[in-house]
């Protein structure tokens, strides 16, 4: 099979997400003290926090086994997505882009977790006293990737419905 006709060439997007995330995390760790916060906008801070769990600090209060669990989970899911990219056609641009963003984000957070034992988060959106959970670029890549997959699924469903009519 000609690999250029698969979704694998979209992995450059994974590399961009991966390295952008790690570079920004390095900048935060080098320039901020833990919990230091700089106000950028009336609803947005850059705040250095450590997340020992998953999204929204899920399982953060456990004894440490979750580090290995989340690293393994990221690797397994990434390999599954790589298989999907291999099976996809290059013309499936929206789906391939979504998958690539998810791989880049998952592997960046896994690398962070393997190196530090936690994930560095720093985007802090808030309104008055309410703060959204702090997150990072890898999280953004994963969410945008999932959103693109959802949009693609709706588009595929619309195509099927229009063919049936």
Curated annotation (Swiss-Prot):
* NCBIfam families linked: lspA
Upper taxonomic lineage? Bacteria, Pseudomonadati, Pseudomonadota, Gammaproteobacteria, Pasteurellales
The protein's matches in InterPro entries, at most eight in alphabetical order, are given as: Peptidase_A8
Name where it's found: Cell inner membrane
Which family does this protein fall into? Belongs to the peptidase A8 family.
GO CC annotation, single: plasma membrane
| Annotated function | This protein specifically catalyzes the removal of signal peptides from prolipoproteins.
Query: Top enzyme class of this protein?
Result: hydrolase
Q: Name one GO biological process term.
A: proteolysis
Active-site residues are: 121, 139
Q: Which UniProt keywords apply?
A: Aspartyl protease, Cell inner membrane, Cell membrane, Hydrolase, Membrane, Protease, Transmembrane, Transmembrane helix
Q: Which reaction does this chain catalyze? A: Release of signal peptides from bacterial membrane prolipoproteins. Hydrolyzes -Xaa-Yaa-Zaa-|-(S,diacylglyceryl)Cys-, in which Xaa is hydrophobic (preferably Leu), and Yaa (Ala or Ser) and Zaa (Gly or Ala) have small, neutral side chains
**Name of protein:** Lipoprotein signal peptidase
Domain of life of the organism encoding this protein: Bacteria
TM stretches of this protein: 9-29, 65-85, 97-119, 134-154
In which pathway is this protein known to take part?
Protein modification; lipoprotein biosynthesis (signal peptide cleavage)
State its Enzyme Commission number(s): 3.4.23.36
Which GO molecular function annotations are given, in alphabetical order?
aspartic-type endopeptidase activity
């Amino acid at each position: 099979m000609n690999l250029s006709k698969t979704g694998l060439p979209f992995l450059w997007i994974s590399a961009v997400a991966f390295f952008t995330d790690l570079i920004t995390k390095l900048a935060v760790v080098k320039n901020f003290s833990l919990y230091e916060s700089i106000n950028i906008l009336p609803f947005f801070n850059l705040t250095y926090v450590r997340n020992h769990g998953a999204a929204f600090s899920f399982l953060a209060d456990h004894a440490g086994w979750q580090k290995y669990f989340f690293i393994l989970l990221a690797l397994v899911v990434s390999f599954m997505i790589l298989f999907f990219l291999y099976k996809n056609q290059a013309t499936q641009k929206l789906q391939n882009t979504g998958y690539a963003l998810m791989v880049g984000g998952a592997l960046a957070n896994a690398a962070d977790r393997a190196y530090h034992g936690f994930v560095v988060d720093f985007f802090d959106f808030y309104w008055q006293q309410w703060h959204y959970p702090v997150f990072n670029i890898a999280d953004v890549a994963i969410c945008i990737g999932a959103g693109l997959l959802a949009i693609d699924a709706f588009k595929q469903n619309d195509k099927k419905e229009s063919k049936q009519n």
